[in-house]
């Protein structure tokens, strides 16, 4: 039986004895954590293993949900996050291993992990923030995944009806595409979505990385809860998103490492 907090208040009680956490941030993402976990475990046989790596674990908001459910959890994130007393106390209480890592491009913290360690790797709301060539990172992740392990990817949908692609006003003003100039100049690097993907493009991404990867499940995901996107939709927009999956705001992809024969086959070049 999957363990899930009864509601958000019960979820917050997990953090309270250890110094609490950011309530506003956790409230905003709570339904994403819950729904993603339900999707994963609805198609995962626990007999396959329970070692889970959360890449970009932040304040352990997602990691804790798996730790209380019997998973052996490891989290990787920036040292400044894992130095927080409340994060360290929560990790100790729930036997979550913390791997501080200041350079995800090379994923140096993962080098201490033995080959074929993890059964599930969470890569949720991370891929859109990457600003570097990720091949070296994926080599490390591939190495520590067991044959048969699954990589879980969630990310915004490039074709989302409420996404930046459909900004007609910006198009008519000839202000280009992608990130806006003021966002690039005024916000820190990892605050941005530097690259958003379509579902087909995301599947192609992993097919190119390695023929050992097999995309075994995929979904266009509706808004996790009203207000999650920070952009009003209205009844008509929500109706369109329900009827046309391509226009839904989020993507969910399960990539299985079916075997370890070819490895990561991409070699970056100038």
Predicted regions and their residues:
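Conserved class I S-adenosyl-L-methionine
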Residues: 48-58
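S-adenosyl-L-methionine-dependent methyltransferase catalytic module, highlighting the catalytic core
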Residues: 3-33, 78, 89-95, 100-109, ...
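A short SAM/SAH-binding and catalytic strip from SAM-dependent methyltransferases
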Residues: 120-132
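A short acidic, Gly/Pro-enriched loop at the edge of an enzyme's catalytic core
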Residues: 109-121
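Helix N-cap at the beta1-alpha1 junction of Rossmann-like dinucleotide-binding domains, i.e.
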Residues: 80-82
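Conserved SAM-binding motif I beta-strand of class I
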Residues: 72-77
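Conserved SAM-binding loop of SAM-dependent methyltransferases across substrates and taxa
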Residues: 59-70
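Conserved alpha-helix/loop element of class I SAM-dependent methyltransferases that forms part
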Residues: 29-49
């Amino acid at each position: 039986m999957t363990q899930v907090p009864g509601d958000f208040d019960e979820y917050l009680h997990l953090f309270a004895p250890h110094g609490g956490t950011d309530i506003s941030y956790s409230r905003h993402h709570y339904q994403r954590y819950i729904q993603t976990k339900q999707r994963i475990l609805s198609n995962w046989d626990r007999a396959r293993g329970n070692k889970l790596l959360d890449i970009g674990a932040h304040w352990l908001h997602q990691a804790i949900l798996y730790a209380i459910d019997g998973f052996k959890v490891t989290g990787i994130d920036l040292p400044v996050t894992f130095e927080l007393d409340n994060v360290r106390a929560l990790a100790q209480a729930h036997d979550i291993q913390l791997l501080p890592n200041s350079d995800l491009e090379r994923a140096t913290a993962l080098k201490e992990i033995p080959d074929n360690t993890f059964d599930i790797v969470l890569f949720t709301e991370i891929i859109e923030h990457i600003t570097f060539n990720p091949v070296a990172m994926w080599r490390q992740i591939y190495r520590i995944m067991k044959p048969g392990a699954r990589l879980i990817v969630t990310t915004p949908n490039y074709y989302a009806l409420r996404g930046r692609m459909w900004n007609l006003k910006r198009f008519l003003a000839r202000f280009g595409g992608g990130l806006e100039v003021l966002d690039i100049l005024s916000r820190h690097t990892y605050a941005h979505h530097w690259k958003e993907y379509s579902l087909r493009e995301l599947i192609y991404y992993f097919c190119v990385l390695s023929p050992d990867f097999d995309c075994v499940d995929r979904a266009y995901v509706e808004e996790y809860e009203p207000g999650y996107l920070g952009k009003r939709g209205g009844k008509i927009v929500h109706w369109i998103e329900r009827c046309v999956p391509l226009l839904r705001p989020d993507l969910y992809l399960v990539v299985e490492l079916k075997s370890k024969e070819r490895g990561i086959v991409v070699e970056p070049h100038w």
